[in-house]
Amino acid sequence: MSSASVGKKPEHVNTPPGDNQQKSSKENQKSNKDKQSSNQPPGQIPHSTNSGTRKSSGSGLKTANLKHPARPSTESSTSSSHHRRPAQEMNGTSTATATGGGGTSGATTTASSGAPAASSGGSSARYSSSGRSHPTSGSSSSHARSTGQSGMSSRSAARRNDQDVHVGKYKLLKTIGKGNFAKVKLAKHVITGHEVAIKIIDKTALNPSSLQKLFREVKIMKQLDHPNIVKLYQVMETEQTLYLVLEYASGGEVFDYLVAHGRMKEKEARAKFRQIVSAVQYLHSKNIIHRDLKAENLLLDQDMNIKIADFGFSNTFSLGNKLDTFCGSPPYAAPELFSGKKYDGPEVDVWSLGVILYTLVSGSLPFDGQNLKELRERVLRGKYRIPFYMSTDCENLLKKFLVINPQRRSSLDNIMKDRWMNVGYEDDELKPFIEPPKDQIDEQRIEKLIQIFQLGFNKAAILESVEKEKFEDIHATYLLLGERKSDMDASEITMAQSLLSHSSINVSSSLGQHPAGVITREHVTSSSASGSSASPSRYSRSSATATGASITAGSALASAANAQKHQQSSAAPSSGSSSSRRSSQNDAAATAAGGTVVMSGTRHGGVQMRAQPTSRQATISLLQPPSYKPSSNTTQIAQIPPLFNRNSTATSSAAQPSTGITGTRKIADPKGRIPLNSTAVQGHRTATGAVAANNGGIPSHRDHAQQQQYMNQLTSSTMMSKLINKTPAAGGTAATSSSSSSSATSTAPLQKSGSQISHAPTEPVIREDDDENNSENQNGNVPLIGGVGPQTSPAVQVPTEDATSSSDKEQQQQKASSETPKESKPSMIHQSPSMPPSQMMTAMESLKLSESGQTGGPTVATGGPPQRATSQQMSRSATTNSANMGASSGGAAAAASATNQLSGAPSSTGASSQQYHPKAPSSSSSSSTNPPHQHQLTHNASFSVTPSSYQIPTSTAVNVTSTGMPTSSSSSAFPRNTRNRQTFHGKTEKDKGGDDSSDEIGETPGNVSIGATGPSANNAEATIWSKLSKLTRRDHNRESMTQPVSGRAGTIGASQGQQTAAALAAIREQSGPIAPGAGQVAPSLPIHEGDVKPRSLRFTWSMKTTSSLAPDDMMREIRKVLDANGCDYEQRERYMILCVHGDPNTDSLVQWEMEVCKLPRLSLNGVRFKRISGTSIGFKNIASKIAQELNL
């Protein structure tokens, strides 16, 4: 039997005998199929069952209808950083969708038939792994729900056995993160009792370029030893699965901390920032750049110390060799990246550090915008607002970081000497970190290792493992002993020895055919690939998306022979990445003499990885070559079947309670950011929902006819006049000034920028990174932002895995759109997913194109009064796969969708960005039907009338604004899934070629990359978006409908299309902005006025006063007080007023915003004041006076 690296392996669960009897007839009927499938080396895995009652929990489940992306992009992993917030593992309903990148790709053989693969409760049940996704025990996947009885029995079995599941020397506790190709488990080291995070990666789901990225990432992490960088402890590998044992940061992300507690005081920010600078300087000293530094990738341990995670975009640099890949999240990206210039490396991280410092101190982003185009212009302009509470020393330090010219940007060595950095640390000036010498070994720990492993290894072998840093059991135990705050006493050592004898189920390398499951070390080591870098160590996007990896506690030990057979068939040798030998070998505790040692799990249970029935094999073995070859004696290891069944839902999650993950990358489609509560810091977080992914498709808020009508309204003269009238009255000039606009954006709420793994740009040009340029975008013809690409807008279309039809998608979109409106309330901080390079690059191009002439002028889209980005606060970016984004247009479309809509440049992929497609309407099934002119306006226009319009299809990045739906960028500048918030990873304009997206883009649904586990990419997108939207965007209804779009109007043009953009440009050129008279209420869109509600404000420190009055009553009171104080004002939205006070001819002119907002979790409303322009003293005087006079 072969353990197909490509095939899915059904998990076995102990089921009550009655259940078996009920299903026995079916099983007998299908036994022929099972036998037949057993002959297929890649497709099946025979599992030896210990009892006749053992059967697949998913038997009888039909997965044929699941959509499956063909080879999802590796970087789409969103669960990557293992400490991140726990993906929602719905206790009874872990999303069964395998599609998130793990759909049942090609459920061709028995799977399609829907016949149960499990053989009757015979001794060895054979399962055709080919197309069936059997939910693992404890996964109550949607499929499992269909079977009812079997699903319940599997869940009960999981509850019984879950506590006994081991991988190597680690006891698995719970799932803390999930993605398309990876799952992150919280585990406890049985020897030291130390908690770790284990990232379990399905290698069969990764294409060669993705494996290369993982290889590089692991290689880099193995070199790092800094107290403020997430540590890699161990690398284990089977033929189909890679296990990375990482440091567990229980305190969560800095981003979450800011959401829960608001901005830090400078003293607290200084303590954190010193650690960040020390870690990044250490990276630069080793010629490594991170390239995705942001608040979401900064974790906190239990002592609130910083841990930098997510090295998925990291790379090495050398002076004189320029890099050209656009990586990272746009709000944190340096100007040279937006301008498409090559860069040395460190200066890009320095800029990101400046943005992080600003974020820590202010709780908002220095550069933000309604769309990618606005953001790009503000970053290139380099203007940001200094909060009145920021100290002069901190302001001066920021000026060293945020320098547009990279040559003039300070180095971190100089930053360390800055005055602000060392205030309060006069006796401990920040100095470069000195790494302990490699040859410095702790003899006490060595002695303990000798006592613990006395049965398996002698001192020489232990010293060799530690000195050569093999990243296997002994080395990991050595490292973890160093993490203990107290030494192990004799009783603990004795207990550890007893645990070693029977507790661990070894990860079988499955190399070579040994019928009894005996695996020779030579075999394991010989197959290992050379690169220690191979295994991805971080919780990063790269392979972080777990496709529903499931752990079955009761799974029978599969014979190693099957896996071995398959491995032989597979071209790529599997190897444990960094360690020269598999951890399983270590687990087996091979005797020093080399005698065979048989290791059995406590309950036969192990992590069962079920490979997706793809025809792909693990392309690259991540094991590095063995540093030594022990004797040929074999160690018999119980094989653990692959953990991932891409077809199956993340079943294990159901059995396990969802818990906060501090280090794991959030699922691309977290249900919504939830502020940390007191316990959250301890690592307990509300589960972010990966689950939502199964619900929706790409949301389209209205059908084609409605969209047409809607777009016609937008382009009508009345609409245009409303747009133009949006500029503020008396202070209009100031508002429109670049400084004011930039200042407005600076206050934009924190949006999380989750890194999205991106596909490389469509056309490989400069191959700075192997992985970044590898694949060709199948859809790569389409420029992200500017050009018109293939008529089919892959963004929406891509999600259509084999079976998804455009009609299905439309239905999904409608469903999603119907769901999303209620989620429209933005949380002030939005995640900003990292964007893949290809998307970013195309976005950049389209921006430039739009500036050059399509929009009728570079500033047409962006020009105008200050954007109300402030309300957006930091928006977090969910890490979505670029693959998803790329899926629509080969990755470029994804970025384009975000930027095109926003930038006004036509987007080649209609679906993805709804941008105007000058040449042809996008053909993407979901919303591509609209002609380019019909493309909705971006948020700036705030034309999106209905909430659904605001919501961006969850298709990860690509569908950010699927053509069918206008995205109301104004509401949340960068909702998590939007392009703007995503980390880009792609070549600069000059180097658009990116292979990564090539097959993945075409094959994986755009949404899948987000880590949606839903059956279809569309579902994943919709649900992901809906989840994200809850937190990230404001009530788009209110904003988009009522807001006349004064300051933001500029960004509208591009998204509507060339016609609208050109019309706006012509009108502005002729008449200039029209400012409504002072005190005059600017016209607002009447549509659905009654539905508009105050925005729910997550950051409450800007509230000056609260009241239980109705919002409209509060607005009347505010206008009354403004009139009494002689203030000019313009009601720009139903619950937001732009106010002006003072003499424009003197320095006393002050502009500010007043907004009635709803307080979270309280039945109260509050008034938010935000200064737009003028001195802080002048603003405080008038704002305090008005606040005192308000009778609320």
Curated annotation (Swiss-Prot):
Q: Compositional bias (Low complexity) at which positions?
A: 106-151, 525-541, 558-598, 648-659, 729-748, 857-866, 886-898
Tissue specificity, in the record's words, reads: Asymmetrically localized to the posterior of the zygote before mitotic division, then differentially distributed to the germline precursor cells (at protein level).
- Reaction(s) catalyzed by this protein? L-seryl-[protein] + ATP = O-phospho-L-seryl-[protein] + ADP + H(+); L-threonyl-[protein] + ATP = O-phospho-L-threonyl-[protein] + ADP + H(+)
Q: Where is the composition biased (Polar residues)?
A: 46-62, 749-759, 829-841, 868-885, 899-916, 929-938, 959-977
Q: What class of enzyme is it?
A: transferase
Keyword Transferase appears in the UniProt entry = yes
* Residue span(s) of domain KA1: 1143-1192
Q: Which UniProt keywords apply?
A: ATP-binding, Cytoplasm, Developmental protein, Kinase, Magnesium, Metal-binding, Nucleotide-binding, Phosphoprotein, Serine/threonine-protein kinase, Transferase
Coiled-coil annotated residue ranges, if any: none
List the active site: D292
Q: Where does ATP bind?
A: I176, G177, K178, G179, N180, F181, A182, K183, V184, K199
One of the record's GO cellular component terms: P granule
Domain Protein kinase: residue ranges: 170-421
Could you state what the record's PTM comment says about this protein?
A: Phosphorylated at Thr-325 probably by par-4.
Under PROSITE patterns, the record lists: KA1 (PS50032), PROTEIN_KINASE_ATP (PS00107), PROTEIN_KINASE_DOM (PS50011), PROTEIN_KINASE_ST (PS00108), UBA (PS50030)
Required co-factor(s) are: Mg(2+)
Q: Which domain of life is it from?
A: Eukaryota
For the UBA domain, which residue ranges apply?
Answer: 440-482
Q: What GO biological process terms does the UniProt entry carry, in alphabetical order?
A: asymmetric neuroblast division; asymmetric protein localization involved in cell fate determination; embryonic pattern specification; establishment of cell polarity; establishment or maintenance of cell polarity; intracellular signal transduction; microtubule cytoskeleton organization; polarity specification of anterior/posterior axis
Feature: compositional bias, Basic and acidic residues: 24-36, 986-995
The entry sums up its family as follows:
Belongs to the protein kinase superfamily. CAMK Ser/Thr protein kinase family. SNF1 subfamily.
* Role noted for this protein: Required for cytoplasmic partitioning and asymmetric cell division in early embryogenesis. Phosphorylates and restricts the asymmetry effector mex-5 (and possibly also mex-6) to the anterior cytoplasm of the zygote. Regulates mes-1 expression during early embryogenesis. Critical role in postembryonic vulval morphogenesis. Involved in the establishment of neuronal polarity.
Q: What is the official name of this protein in its record?
A: Serine/threonine-protein kinase par-1
